[in-house]
A protein has these predicted regions:
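Helix-adjacent hinge/juxtasegments
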Residues: 59-90
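Interfacial loop-to-transmembrane junctions
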Residues: 113-140
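The first (N-terminal) embedded transmembrane alpha-helix
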Residues: 9-30, 136-142
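Short juxtamembrane and helix-loop transition motifs at transmembrane-helix boundaries
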Residues: 3-6, 33-41, 56-69, 116-123
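Cytoplasmic-side transmembrane-helix entry/capping segments in multi-pass membrane proteins
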Residues: 12-15, 68-79, 100-103, 126-136
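Alpha-helical transmembrane segments and their membrane-interface exit regions
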Residues: 50-51, 103-116
C-alpha cells in the first residue's frame, strides 16, 4: 500500500467522522418531538458553522506548504468564515430559515466559483471526488434542516414572527 493511499484513506476517515454528527443531528430532526427538534435544528446549524470554521483553518494551514498559491488560499480561507458568519447573523436577526437557506445556496454555489474550482482541480482525482461527495451530503443535510423550518404542519418558524 502506497503512502498516498494511506494518506487519502486517513483523510477520508477524518472527513467522514467529522460530518457524522451533523448527519445524525439532521436526521434526528424528523424523529424527535417538536420542542426537541427546535433545539436540534439550531444545534445542527451551529455544528455546521463550526465545521466551516475548521475548514477555514485547514485552508489557512495549507498556505505554508503551497507558496505559489498563498494569496489565493488566503482569500479562499476567508470564504467559509464569511459564509458561517453571515448564515449565523441572518439566522439570529431574521430567522433560521434565511440563515440555513443562505448556507445551502452558498455551499452549493461555491463549487462553481472559478478560483475555488481551480484550486480544487489541482488536487488528485480521489480528493476531488471526495470533496464532491461531501458537498452533496452537506447540501442534503442543509435541505433537511431547511424543510424542517419551512414545514407547514408544525410551523416551527412562527416563533420568530
Amino acid at each position: 500500500m502506497s503512502y498516498e493511499n494511506v494518506l487519502f484513506r486517513s483523510f477520508r476517515g477524518i472527513v467522514f467522522i467529522s460530518i457524522t454528527p451533523f448527519i445524525l443531528l439532521t436526521a434526528s430532526l424528523w424523529f424527535s418531538s417538536d420542542e426537541t427538534a427546535f433545539i436540534l435544528a439550531h444545534v445542527s446549524q451551529v455544528y455546521f458553522s463550526i465545521l466551516l470554521f475548521f475548514l477555514a483553518g485547514i485552508i489557512w494551514g495549507m498556505r505554508a506548504s503551497l507558496i505559489k498559491e498563498q494569496t489565493e488560499l488566503l482569500l479562499i480561507a476567508f470564504v467559509p468564515i464569511l459564509i458561517a458568519t453571515i448564515g449565523g447573523i441572518s439566522s439570529f436577526y431574521i430567522n433560521p430559515a434565511w440563515g440555513v437557506g443562505f448556507l445551502l445556496l452558498t455551499i452549493y454555489g461555491i463549487r462553481h466559483v472559478k478560483v475555488i474550482n481551480n484550486q480544487i482541480n489541482k488536487l488528485e482525482q480521489p480528493y476531488v471526488v471526495l470533496i464532491d461527495k461531501i458537498s452533496i451530503i452537506l447540501c442534503i443535510c442543509l435541505m433537511v434542516i431547511l424543510t424542517y423550518w419551512l414545514n407547514p404542519y408544525t410551523n416551527p418558524i412562527e416563533v420568530y414572527y
